Protein backbone atom coordinates (compact mmCIF):
# COMPACT_ATOMS: atom_id res chain seq x y z
CA UNK A 1 0.00 0.00 0.00
CA UNK A 2 1.02 3.59 -0.65
CA UNK A 3 1.44 4.91 2.90
CA UNK A 4 3.57 1.94 4.02
CA UNK A 5 5.82 2.59 1.04
CA UNK A 6 6.05 6.28 1.96
CA UNK A 7 7.32 5.37 5.45
CA UNK A 8 10.03 3.19 3.90
CA UNK A 9 10.83 5.97 1.46
CA UNK A 10 11.43 8.41 4.34
CA UNK A 11 13.44 5.85 6.37
CA UNK A 12 15.56 4.87 3.39
CA UNK A 13 16.08 8.49 2.41
CA UNK A 14 18.49 9.21 5.27
CA UNK A 15 20.74 6.28 4.41
CA UNK A 16 20.49 7.13 0.70
CA UNK A 17 21.48 10.77 1.29
CA UNK A 18 24.45 9.56 3.36
CA UNK A 19 25.44 7.29 0.45
CA UNK A 20 24.85 4.21 2.64
CA UNK A 21 23.44 2.34 -0.33
CA UNK A 22 23.40 -1.09 1.37
CA UNK A 23 21.06 0.12 4.12
CA UNK A 24 19.05 2.26 1.70
CA UNK A 25 18.51 -0.64 -0.69
CA UNK A 26 17.27 -2.92 2.12
CA UNK A 27 14.70 -0.35 3.23
CA UNK A 28 13.69 0.80 -0.27
CA UNK A 29 13.27 -2.85 -1.37
CA UNK A 30 10.56 -3.29 1.30
CA UNK A 31 8.85 -0.11 0.13
CA UNK A 32 9.12 -1.12 -3.52
CA UNK A 33 7.54 -4.49 -2.70
CA UNK A 34 4.67 -2.65 -0.96
CA UNK A 35 4.15 -0.19 -3.83
CA UNK A 36 5.93 -0.81 -7.17
CA UNK A 37 4.18 2.28 -8.58
CA UNK A 38 6.14 4.60 -6.27
CA UNK A 39 8.56 5.39 -9.09
CA UNK A 40 10.55 7.95 -7.11
CA UNK A 41 11.49 5.31 -4.57
CA UNK A 42 12.01 2.73 -7.32
CA UNK A 43 14.58 5.03 -8.95
CA UNK A 44 16.40 5.46 -5.62
CA UNK A 45 16.39 1.69 -5.10
CA UNK A 46 17.75 1.05 -8.60
CA UNK A 47 20.43 3.69 -8.09
CA UNK A 48 21.39 2.14 -4.73
CA UNK A 49 21.88 -1.25 -6.39
CA UNK A 50 23.89 0.28 -9.24
CA UNK A 51 26.08 2.32 -6.90
CA UNK A 52 26.86 -0.84 -4.91
CA UNK A 53 27.66 -2.65 -8.16
CA UNK A 54 30.02 0.15 -9.22
CA UNK A 55 31.98 -0.01 -5.96
CA UNK A 56 32.00 -3.81 -5.58
CA UNK A 57 31.88 -5.00 -9.19
CA UNK A 58 28.99 -7.31 -8.17
CA UNK A 59 27.06 -7.86 -11.40
CA UNK A 60 24.01 -9.26 -9.59
CA UNK A 61 23.52 -5.84 -7.93
CA UNK A 62 23.80 -4.16 -11.34
CA UNK A 63 21.22 -6.58 -12.76
CA UNK A 64 18.80 -5.87 -9.88
CA UNK A 65 19.15 -2.16 -10.58
CA UNK A 66 18.59 -2.62 -14.32
CA UNK A 67 15.48 -4.72 -13.70
CA UNK A 68 13.91 -1.93 -11.65
CA UNK A 69 14.98 0.77 -14.14
CA UNK A 70 13.39 -1.33 -16.94
CA UNK A 71 10.13 -1.54 -14.95
CA UNK A 72 10.03 2.24 -14.41
CA UNK A 73 11.06 2.98 -18.02
CA UNK A 74 8.20 0.77 -19.25
CA UNK A 75 5.50 2.80 -17.46
CA UNK A 76 3.41 4.60 -20.06
CA UNK A 77 1.00 6.70 -17.97
CA UNK A 78 1.81 10.43 -18.42
CA UNK A 79 2.21 10.90 -14.64
CA UNK A 80 5.27 8.61 -14.82
CA UNK A 81 6.78 10.31 -17.88
CA UNK A 82 9.49 12.19 -15.98
CA UNK A 83 10.56 9.19 -13.90
CA UNK A 84 10.45 6.89 -16.96
CA UNK A 85 12.79 9.29 -18.79
CA UNK A 86 15.08 9.43 -15.74
CA UNK A 87 15.14 5.61 -15.59
CA UNK A 88 16.29 5.45 -19.22
CA UNK A 89 18.99 8.07 -18.57
CA UNK A 90 20.26 6.26 -15.47
CA UNK A 91 20.27 2.89 -17.25
CA UNK A 92 22.51 4.36 -19.92
CA UNK A 93 24.72 6.10 -17.34
CA UNK A 94 25.31 3.02 -15.17
CA UNK A 95 25.68 0.68 -18.12
CA UNK A 96 28.29 2.97 -19.67
CA UNK A 97 30.07 3.30 -16.30
CA UNK A 98 30.12 -0.48 -15.88
CA UNK A 99 31.36 -0.90 -19.46
CA UNK A 100 34.12 1.67 -18.87
CA UNK A 101 35.18 -0.20 -15.73
CA UNK A 102 35.34 -3.50 -17.64
CA UNK A 103 37.08 -1.91 -20.63
CA UNK A 104 39.77 -0.58 -18.30
CA UNK A 105 40.32 -4.19 -17.22
CA UNK A 106 40.14 -5.39 -20.87
CA UNK A 107 37.19 -7.55 -19.80
CA UNK A 108 35.40 -7.58 -23.16
CA UNK A 109 33.84 -10.98 -22.43
CA UNK A 110 32.34 -9.50 -19.26
CA UNK A 111 30.81 -6.68 -21.32
CA UNK A 112 29.43 -9.18 -23.84
CA UNK A 113 27.91 -11.32 -21.07
CA UNK A 114 26.38 -8.23 -19.46
CA UNK A 115 24.89 -7.14 -22.81
CA UNK A 116 23.62 -10.66 -23.56
CA UNK A 117 21.88 -10.75 -20.15
CA UNK A 118 20.24 -7.38 -20.83
CA UNK A 119 19.19 -8.51 -24.32
CA UNK A 120 17.68 -11.72 -22.94
CA UNK A 121 15.27 -9.50 -20.98
CA UNK A 122 14.87 -6.79 -23.61
CA UNK A 123 15.94 -7.85 -27.13
CA UNK A 124 15.29 -4.32 -28.45
CA UNK A 125 17.74 -2.63 -26.07
CA UNK A 126 19.69 -0.24 -28.30
CA UNK A 127 22.19 0.34 -25.48
CA UNK A 128 22.96 -3.36 -24.97
CA UNK A 129 23.28 -3.96 -28.74
CA UNK A 130 25.62 -0.97 -28.95
CA UNK A 131 28.00 -1.94 -26.12
CA UNK A 132 28.03 -5.59 -27.25
CA UNK A 133 29.04 -4.68 -30.81
CA UNK A 134 31.79 -2.38 -29.51
CA UNK A 135 33.10 -5.17 -27.26
CA UNK A 136 33.26 -7.63 -30.17
CA UNK A 137 35.03 -4.96 -32.25
CA UNK A 138 37.53 -4.38 -29.41
CA UNK A 139 38.16 -8.15 -29.31
CA UNK A 140 38.73 -8.01 -33.08
CA UNK A 141 36.06 -10.72 -33.48
CA UNK A 142 35.14 -9.44 -36.92
CA UNK A 143 32.92 -12.41 -37.81
CA UNK A 144 30.73 -11.62 -34.79
CA UNK A 145 30.65 -7.89 -35.66
CA UNK A 146 29.51 -8.79 -39.18
CA UNK A 147 26.89 -11.21 -37.80
CA UNK A 148 25.42 -8.69 -35.32
CA UNK A 149 26.22 -5.32 -36.89
CA UNK A 150 23.12 -4.72 -39.01
CA UNK A 151 20.72 -5.69 -36.21
CA UNK A 152 22.63 -3.43 -33.82
CA UNK A 153 22.42 -0.52 -36.28
CA UNK A 154 18.70 -1.12 -36.88
CA UNK A 155 17.69 -0.70 -33.21
CA UNK A 156 19.70 2.49 -32.58
CA UNK A 157 17.57 5.61 -32.15
CA UNK A 158 20.40 8.14 -31.92
CA UNK A 159 21.95 8.94 -35.35
CA UNK A 160 25.48 9.10 -33.85
CA UNK A 161 25.06 5.63 -32.34
CA UNK A 162 23.66 4.27 -35.62
CA UNK A 163 26.68 5.74 -37.43
CA UNK A 164 29.08 4.09 -35.00
CA UNK A 165 27.44 0.67 -35.58
CA UNK A 166 27.89 1.07 -39.35
CA UNK A 167 31.46 2.25 -38.85
CA UNK A 168 32.29 -0.87 -36.77
CA UNK A 169 30.55 -3.04 -39.36
CA UNK A 170 32.50 -1.41 -42.19
CA UNK A 171 35.79 -1.84 -40.32
CA UNK A 172 34.98 -5.53 -39.74
CA UNK A 173 34.21 -6.10 -43.44
CA UNK A 174 37.41 -4.24 -44.28
CA UNK A 175 39.45 -6.48 -41.94
CA UNK A 176 37.92 -9.52 -43.68
CA UNK A 177 38.88 -8.10 -47.13
CA UNK A 178 35.18 -7.80 -48.05
CA UNK A 179 35.55 -4.47 -49.84
CA UNK A 180 32.09 -4.00 -51.45
CA UNK A 181 30.35 -4.71 -48.12
CA UNK A 182 32.79 -2.42 -46.30
CA UNK A 183 32.06 0.42 -48.73
CA UNK A 184 28.30 -0.13 -48.39
CA UNK A 185 28.54 0.01 -44.59
CA UNK A 186 30.81 3.09 -44.58
CA UNK A 187 28.28 4.88 -46.83
CA UNK A 188 25.78 4.61 -43.93
CA UNK A 189 28.13 6.51 -41.61
CA UNK A 190 26.90 10.11 -41.29
Label every PLM stretch briefly:
Residues 41, 80-83, 87, 94, ...:
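TPR alpha-solenoid repeat register
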Residues 18, 52, 56-59, 105, ...:
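Structural motif corresponding to the intra-repeat A-B loop/turn of tetratricopeptide repeats
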Residues 13, 47, 51-54, 100, ...:
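Residue-level recognition of tetratricopeptide repeat
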Residues 2, 9, 43, 47-50, ...:
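TPR/TPR-like alpha-solenoid signature
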Residues 31, 72, 117-118, 151-152, ...:
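Canonical positions in the second alpha-helix
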Residues 36-37, 77, 123, 157-160:
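Short coil turns that delineate tetratricopeptide repeat
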Amino acid sequence: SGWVAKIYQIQGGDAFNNKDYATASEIFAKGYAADPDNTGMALNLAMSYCEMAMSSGDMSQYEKGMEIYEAVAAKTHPKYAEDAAKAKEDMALYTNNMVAKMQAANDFDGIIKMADDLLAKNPQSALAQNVRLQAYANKKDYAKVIELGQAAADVQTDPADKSLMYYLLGAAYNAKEMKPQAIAAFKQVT
